[in-house]
């Protein structure tokens, strides 16, 4: 179970008291997290999620609080940091930054259909529109293009011939097209919008969670990350009907530009590289530990399938 920082009931009761939400009824560690420690918290006045942030600089935590406040004020279904009765949102527990947030209704879906994908595309467009231009809150990701080039080059020697050649080709493409990628239209992006970070009740999207990889960056990169997960089949091939539903719903709210249409195949590959590398690193770092490790080969397979992209962006000339 991925509870990196275990907590005892008395510690929790002391921490939760300043929120004025009643007695602690129950709490449970969440096994699904792979980077942070999360607990479901039941208090007399409702259901909540407590997050202890395990990765990233503490000084960047106000970014996440401010971003979620902006999205909450834009009526998007996102968690947001609750304040204590003294108005404090960011607190500390066991030496880690700690946030208490409302627990959103719904559950994750394992198999997405076109209706699910359309709702995710629509919500992602709303997220980007709410934070583009002057509304964007700046934060540089710690897993951007420079990180991919550095970590990818280091990992080449860890791979056998075929995956090494696949990764090298992708790194060469990132180097060649880096300036064009960075010049694409920008906003705040979720940067991790996988199926396990969205909540559904049936086919109704009820929430988007886990913004701890969020940053400012190219909106197309965010689209590519999400589509690679929501619209891939078991062999890593993009499913046309799901992809068209996703992209059509997104573009109905924020039409894609000519530059985005040109870089779409590249960006799908870049999004694969980012998660292939982070999973390879996690697999080495946490080998033999009781930590959820996502399969790196899933994104190696997807990158191989993205060498040819047959689903273009819906772009009106």
Describe the residue ranges of each PLM region.
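ATP-binding pocket architecture of kinase catalytic cores
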Residues: 43-136
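A cross-family kinase active-site recognition segment
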Residues: 110-164, 184-186, 292-293
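Active-site acidic catalytic loop and adjacent metal/ATP-binding pocket
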Residues: 31-44, 49-50, 81, 175-221, ...
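A glycine-centered beta->alpha junction motif in the catalytic cores
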Residues: 98-111, 150-158, 273-289
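All-alpha amphipathic helical-bundle segments outside canonical DNA-binding/catalytic cores
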Residues: 256-268
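Conserved NTP-binding catalytic cores of kinases and kinase-like/nucleotidyltransferase enzymes
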Residues: 1-85, 201-204, 311-317
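Active-site activation/catalytic loop segments of kinase-like enzymes and analogous catalytic loops
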Residues: 220-255, 270-287
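ATP/Mg2+ or Mg2+-diphosphate-binding catalytic cores
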Residues: 153-154, 275-317
């Amino acid at each position: 179970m991925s509870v990196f920082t275990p907590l005892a009931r008395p510690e929790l009761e002391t921490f939760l008291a300043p929120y004025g939400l009643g007695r602690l009824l129950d709490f449970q560690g969440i096994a699904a997290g792979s980077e942070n420690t999360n607990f479901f918290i039941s208090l007399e006045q409702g259901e909540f999620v407590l997050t202890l942030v395990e990765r990233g600089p503490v000084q960047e935590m106000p970014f996440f609080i401010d971003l979620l406040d902006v999205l909450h004020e834009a009526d998007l279904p996102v968690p947001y940091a609750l304040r204590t009765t003294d108005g404090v949102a960011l607190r500390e527990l066991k030496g880690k930054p700690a946030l208490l947030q409302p627990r959103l209704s719904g559950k994750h879906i394992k198999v997405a259909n076109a209706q699910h994908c359309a709702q995710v595309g629509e919500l992602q467009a709303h997220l980007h529109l709410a934070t583009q231009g002057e509304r964007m809150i700046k934060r540089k990701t710690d897993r951007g293009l420079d990180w991919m080039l550095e970590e990818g080059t280091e990992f080449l020697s860890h791979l056998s011939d075929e995956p090494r050649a696949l990764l090298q080709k992708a790194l060469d493409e990132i180097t060649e097209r880096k300036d064009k990628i960075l010049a694409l239209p920008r906003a705040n992006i979720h940067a991790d919008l996988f199926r396990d970070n969205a909540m559904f009740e049936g086919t109704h999207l009820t929430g988007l969670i886990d913004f701890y990889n969020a940053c400012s960056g190219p909106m197309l990169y965010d689209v590519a990350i999400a589509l690679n997960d929501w619209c891939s089949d078991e062999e890593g091939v993009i499913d046309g009907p799901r992809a068209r539903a996703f992209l059509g719903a997104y573009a109905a709210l924020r039409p894609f530009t000519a530059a985005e249409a040109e870089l779409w195949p590249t960006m799908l590959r870049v999004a694969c590289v980012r998660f292939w590398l982070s999973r390879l690193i996690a697999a080495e770092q946490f080998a033999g530990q009781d930590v959820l490790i996502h399969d790196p080969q899933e994104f190696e397979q997807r990158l191989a399938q993205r060498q040819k992209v047959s689903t273009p962006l819906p772009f009106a000339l």
